[in-house]
Amino acid sequence: MKTVQLDQLKQQFPLIQTLQDYQETFWFNPHRYPLNEALAKVGLTEQDVKEAEARLARFAPYLAKVFPETQAQHGKIESALVKIADMQQALSLQKHKTLIGKLWLKKDSHLPISGSIKARGGIYEVLAHAEKLAIEAGLLKLEDDYSKLDQDSFRTFFSKYQIAVGSTGNLGLSIGIMSAKLGFRVSVHMSADARQWKKDKLRSLGVNVVEYASDYGVAVEEGRKAAEQDPFCFFIDDENSTTLFLGYAVAGLRLKQQFEQKQIKVDADHPLFVYLPCGVGGGPGGVSFGLKLAFGEHVHCIFAEPTHSPCMLLGVYTGLHDQISVNDIGLDNITAADGLAVGRASGFVGRAMQQLIDGYYTIHDECLYELIALLNQTENIQVEPSAAAGMMGPYYVQTTPDYLALHQLSAEKLQHATHVVWATGGGMVPPDEMQKYLTHSQSN
């Protein structure tokens, strides 16, 4: 972006200066539409989400058969919702300010199969593609027991096809594991941020890992180009895929069921706040869409991004979406939160969700390290740095009077609030890597 254009943009959008200075900030969205109007602009419906849920149910017998870790939930890929009262108390002490309401952790960090939120969207899109191919070939019917897919004849059939994806790590891991299990040939195009252990894991499964010295955007673009050369190759597009988005959206309906089981009330007097780490936007965008369908006006969805990679905040705040990257304003897009190291947000998610997401904030890497150490110490839960990004959200909410006034959130309502921090990854991190994460804050 030319200097002149940037200067003009900064006059119009003064918060850009704060982002350029790598300062932590919170921006609540003044462009929220009434719920039904905003949902209509997404271009997808509750019926689409229910169909995605039904497809996952069809695959459950197969998943339970080939992934023993899913058997306890009968092939359902779902995570626990746990109250983290000790963490809440520790945060209150650390911040010298009581965190009001009840704090919960959604442990997508420990989802079966691939140990991250990407086990939702990534695995779902691979399954949807496999189902389509098998049905078109006359090998599968919707009413079949899908455990039949665990046969050499199906693996041989799928081996004619290739699946490709560009990733900073976790999406590649989810898609690689699932595709390889079904028998597909797989290529994962990985950015410079991707952790070595993730590449090693994929290669051990026979996945073709293509490495780039550049960031996420380049890995996706190169992956897309390579896939175009092969008519038997299906490219999973993290930036634009509605199928991925729907795989994530199922989480909203599932969380509502968990709330009912735990008798957690959500209504006008008992607001729900959900804090989601955001990279390119597909995961948090899809989950938020599902949450808005499930809980309506009473759920507030807030995205958290690293100070070095606030691509969604920048895109939505300026209205430029994928037409602007963090590099355009001079940021380096280098962060310890490798899953969030994205310079340019998804235009599809930004535009679809801009009237639904309630707020966006940024967080320093050092704060992420402190938070994962504190979570480990207080709750004995281990997550990777990016997964802790949502943990500061409740403070931004309760200390921003304009936000509270806009949503008519009284002190009494906040007392009855439920805060859910969506932990997005870390379940598969090798113990020695996790130890490095946990000791980082002590050594600095």
Swiss-Prot record:
<protein>
    <recommendedName>
        <fullName>Probable D-serine dehydratase</fullName>
        <ecNumber>4.3.1.18</ecNumber>
    </recommendedName>
</protein>
<dbReference type="GO" id="GO:0009097">
    <property type="term" value="P:isoleucine biosynthetic process"/>
</dbReference>
<dbReference type="InterPro" id="IPR000634">
    <property type="entry name" value="Ser/Thr_deHydtase_PyrdxlP-BS"/>
</dbReference>
<keyword id="KW-0663">Pyridoxal phosphate</keyword>
<feature type="modified residue" description="N6-(pyridoxal phosphate)lysine">
    <location>
        <position position="118"/>
    </location>
</feature>
<dbReference type="Pfam" id="PF00291">
    <property type="entry name" value="PALP"/>
</dbReference>
<dbReference type="GO" id="GO:0030170">
    <property type="term" value="F:pyridoxal phosphate binding"/>
</dbReference>
<dbReference type="GO" id="GO:0016836">
    <property type="term" value="F:hydro-lyase activity"/>
</dbReference>
<dbReference type="InterPro" id="IPR001926">
    <property type="entry name" value="TrpB-like_PALP"/>
</dbReference>
<dbReference type="InterPro" id="IPR011780">
    <property type="entry name" value="D_Ser_am_lyase"/>
</dbReference>
<keyword id="KW-0456">Lyase</keyword>
<dbReference type="GO" id="GO:0036088">
    <property type="term" value="P:D-serine catabolic process"/>
</dbReference>
<comment type="similarity">
    <text>Belongs to the serine/threonine dehydratase family. DsdA subfamily.</text>
</comment>
<dbReference type="GO" id="GO:0008721">
    <property type="term" value="F:D-serine ammonia-lyase activity"/>
</dbReference>
<dbReference type="InterPro" id="IPR050147">
    <property type="entry name" value="Ser/Thr_Dehydratase"/>
</dbReference>
<dbReference type="InterPro" id="IPR036052">
    <property type="entry name" value="TrpB-like_PALP_sf"/>
</dbReference>
